[in-house]
Amino acid sequence: MHAIMLKAKLHRAEVTHAVLDYEGSCAIDGDWLDLSGIREYEQIQIYNIDNGERFTTYAIRAENGSKMISVNGAAAHKAKVGDRVIICAYAHYSEAELASHKPRMLYMAPGNQLSHTSEAIPIQVA
């Protein structure tokens, strides 16, 4: 059996660019791609915290250290500069891989400053 699991997440990143007339994709600071394990051209899901939009695109590399999140092409209709987004990548894992799987999560502070990283989401309490 295989399961689709969260592979990586950038939590509360701010959109820095929304470029309608650009080949579709989402440009992400190359340092964050490396740290999260998201690969260039990998399918990603983007969840817009500010307007509720959810959409699929693929990641491309932005300049290392740029703090860039650029939503491009038709997806630029779904996010504007300043919107806070969650960017997720998922992968298929075998039963054997599930035993040791831990997602890589990057948590962003205002201004796209990396706050911290984690491999687990805290248990939600009432």
From Swiss-Prot:
By its UniProt entry, which InterPro entries does this protein fall under? Answer: Asp_de-COase-like_dom_sf (IPR009010), Asp_decarbox (IPR003190)
Per UniProt, what is one GO molecular function of this protein? aspartate 1-decarboxylase activity
Instruction: Please give the residue positions where the record annotates the modification Pyruvic acid (Ser).
Output: S25
List the catalytic activities from the record.
Answer: L-aspartate + H(+) = beta-alanine + CO2
Task: Show the Pfam families listed in the entry.
Answer: Asp_decarbox
Spell out the subcellular localization from the entry. Cytoplasm
Q: How is it modified after translation?
A: Is synthesized initially as an inactive proenzyme, which is activated by self-cleavage at a specific serine bond to produce a beta-subunit with a hydroxyl group at its C-terminus and an alpha-subunit with a pyruvoyl group at its N-terminus.
Q: Which residues participate directly in catalysis?
A: S25 (schiff-base intermediate with substrate), Y58 (proton donor)
Q: Which cofactor does it need?
A: pyruvate
Query: Can you tell me which residues bind substrate?
Result: T57, G73, A74, A75
Q: In which pathway does it act?
A: Cofactor biosynthesis; (R)-pantothenate biosynthesis; beta-alanine from L-aspartate: step 1/1
Please give the GO cellular component terms listed in this UniProt entry: cytosol
The alphabetical list of record keywords is: Autocatalytic cleavage, Cytoplasm, Decarboxylase, Lyase, Pantothenate biosynthesis, Pyruvate, Schiff base, Zymogen
- Gene Ontology biological process terms in this record: alanine biosynthetic process; pantothenate biosynthetic process
> What are the EC numbers?
4.1.1.11
Q: Which pairs of Cys residues are joined through disulfide bonds in the record?
A: none
Cofactor: how and how many bound: Binds 1 pyruvoyl group covalently per subunit.
Listed under subunit, the entry gives: Heterooctamer of four alpha and four beta subunits.
- Which HAMAP family does this one have? PanD
- Primary role: Catalyzes the pyruvoyl-dependent decarboxylation of aspartate to produce beta-alanine.
Q: Which family does it belong to?
A: Belongs to the PanD family.
Protein name according to UniProt: Aspartate 1-decarboxylase
Quick one: which gene encodes this?
Answer: panD
